[in-house]
């Protein structure tokens, strides 16, 4: 049985690129997303055309029992050695008045509760095997709250603290949890492209991306994710931030 890299939130950006990287290095990539079955199949086909193995799984991570059922199914393919929790929880800038309770709760369900449920599902087997890695994509909002980010900042801050508590309990048992702060815009059509719209996204790519290297490239980010998952336990990375060379770090931005 092949070792498995399970990706929760596999789009044509970070998730898909990480899946391709792991599949190219001997893992079966189990790719999961909520919608766009056709896009998911394209990711699977791309991996297989390059000699890797992959499977696509439609997943509504907010639905009770869905994550737990998925983990059981994927463990039948092979041992889940690496998990990437790549669900976003960005709802855009909204004032407190315009942030409904349901909207606030949805951000928490995706960013924090989803990770909790995933950890509960995968860690027992990882602990029993004495090894396993949980990679968690996060955002600047995890370390800095801004106006209009009531749902997102609270959810991502919770995600960060959950990563710390998981490490405190399970690092000594061989389970490595890494909180990866994406501190910048990612050149990803499935996320930033949809938020901005096709025309604005392409304009941004022309001015900051491409040869300018001012947008985070998912394929290059995947190299970092892969490296973290294969670190020696004497020098594990538990948290880091990724940004393009031309971006100011989050702590240097004026309030």
Residue ranges of model-derived segments:
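Conserved glycine-rich cofactor-binding loop
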Residues: 11-13
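Conserved glycine-rich Rossmann-like NAD(P)H-binding loop of the short-chain dehydrogenase/reductase
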Residues: 27-41
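Rossmann-fold cofactor-recognition segment
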Residues: 49-64
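Conserved mid-core segment of classical short-chain dehydrogenase/reductases
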Residues: 68, 88-105, 148-151
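Catalytic loop of short-chain dehydrogenase/reductase
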Residues: 89, 133-158, 164, 168-171, ...
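Catalytic Tyr-X3-Lys loop
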Residues: 97-116, 131, 135, 159
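Amphipathic alpha-helical dimer-interface segment in Rossmann-like NAD(P)H-dependent oxidoreductases
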Residues: 110-128, 168
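C-terminal helical subdomain
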Residues: 172-175, 179-184, 195-255
């Amino acid at each position: 049985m092949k070792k498995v890299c399970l990706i929760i939130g596999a789009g044509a950006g970070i998730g898909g690129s990480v899946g391709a990287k792991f599949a190219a290095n001997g893992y079966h990539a189990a790719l999961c997303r909520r919608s766009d079955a056709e896009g998911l199949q394209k990711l699977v086909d791309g991996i297989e055309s390059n000699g890797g193995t992959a499977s696509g799984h439609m997943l509504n991570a907010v639905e009770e029992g869905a994550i737990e059922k998925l983990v059981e199914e994927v463990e039948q393919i092979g041992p889940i050695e690496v998990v990437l929790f790549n669900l976003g929880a960005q709802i855009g800038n909204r004032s407190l008045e315009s942030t409904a309770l349901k909207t606030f709760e949805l951000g928490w369900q995706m960013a924090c509760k989803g990770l909790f449920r995933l950890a509960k599902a995968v860690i027992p087997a990882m602990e029993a095997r004495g090894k396993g890695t949980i990679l968690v994509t996060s955002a600047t909002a995890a370390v800095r709250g801004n106006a209009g980010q009531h749902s997102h900042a609270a959810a991502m801050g919770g995600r960060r603290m959950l990563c710390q508590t998981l490490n405190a309990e399970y690092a000594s048992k061989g389970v490595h949890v890494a909180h990866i702060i994406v501190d910048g815009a990612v050149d990803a059509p499935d996320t930033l492209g949809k938020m901005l719209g096709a025309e604005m996204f392409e304009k941004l790519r022309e001015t900051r991306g491409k040869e300018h290297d001012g947008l985070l490239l998912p394929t290059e980010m995947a190299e970092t994710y892969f490296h973290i998952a294969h670190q020696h336990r004497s020098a594990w990375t538990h948290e880091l931030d990724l940004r393009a060379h031309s971006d100011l770090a989050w702590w240097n931005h004026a309030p």
